[in-house]
Amino acid sequence: TDQAALAQFGEHIVLTAAQLPKVANASPLVLPLTFRSLAALEADFTLFVHVFGPLEPAGQQPPALLSQWDGWPLHDNFATSGWKAAERLGFRVAVPLPANAPPGEYRVELGWYESSTGARLPVSAAKREIHDNVLVLGNFILSEN
């Protein structure tokens, strides 16, 4: 695996950089992400980002899905089937946050699925939590506007 990899999705997509703000107070939540392909990709995969919360104290109900974003990189203009080997791609994902979302701590997760089937790519990551083929990117605080 890639030394700089935060996570690998399937056989060929590597997340090399991700910036999650510590605090956010306005919609949308902007996430700069950088991916690299280990080989040319033949299929189209869709990136998804989920925001859960607010996070309850440990042992309480699992947090609800607050918001999500699904799409292709670069405003849906760069399908993964066009990625070449060693393609490096940095772009921002803007996840809308509801105006009435209560202040508190929220969790961000992301992953990829095959556009035609919806099947999620398996995820591997050395230092981050994974579940259900989803990478837990981290938490942020939503403050009062």
Language model: regions and residue ranges:
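C-terminal luminal/periplasmic domains and tails of membrane-associated envelope-modifying transferases
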Residues: 1-145
